[in-house]
């Protein structure tokens, strides 16, 4: 396999969208080498995002240009260039990509999925799943301190089930 991968991050997917549908939707832009919806390790349920890998750069860029902000299965999706797993990103912490902290990542602006340092996170702040999202405010998916030690699913600043702080899963 070549060192360069032309991979898109696709966020905001409906829970029902599967790998085959993702591939079918994006294959109109060029040859799709791989398409994968990311599932929760514990529940096996879609986490609402995935990746599509194209054979060439033009196909990837066309897909990003045409599909970012478009609707798929009733949801407005986000499509951008995925950060590579190696090197400069340091495991997705620098400037976007899955779990990235600065300026992007799933859930938008400053904070990745369940990031313990607050500011962004899964569906919070000004991005992700419709503005407020699960963790709402400055909390993220698990409230201020990630899933295990801050607010938990219903904690944080508002959160899915109201309440503030405490809780956890």
Curated annotation (Swiss-Prot):
GO terms for biological process: RNA metabolic process. InterPro entries: Nucleotide-bd_a/b_plait_sf, RBD_domain_sf, RRM2_NsCP33-like, RRM_dom, SLIRP/GR-RBP-like. Residues 6-84 form the RRM domain. Residues 85-101 have a biased composition (Gly residues). Expressed only in roots and stems. SMART domains: RRM (SM00360). It holds the Pfam family RRM_1. CDD domains: RRM2_NsCP33_like. The keyword RNA-binding applies. PROSITE patterns: RRM (PS50102). Residues 80-101, 121-169 are annotated as: Disordered. GO terms for molecular function: RNA binding. Transmembrane segments: none annotated. The keyword Transport does not apply. Keywords: RNA-binding. Possibly has a role in RNA transcription or processing during stress. This is Glycine-rich RNA-binding protein 10. The lineage of its organism: Eukaryota, Viridiplantae, Streptophyta, Embryophyta, Tracheophyta. The gene is GRP10.
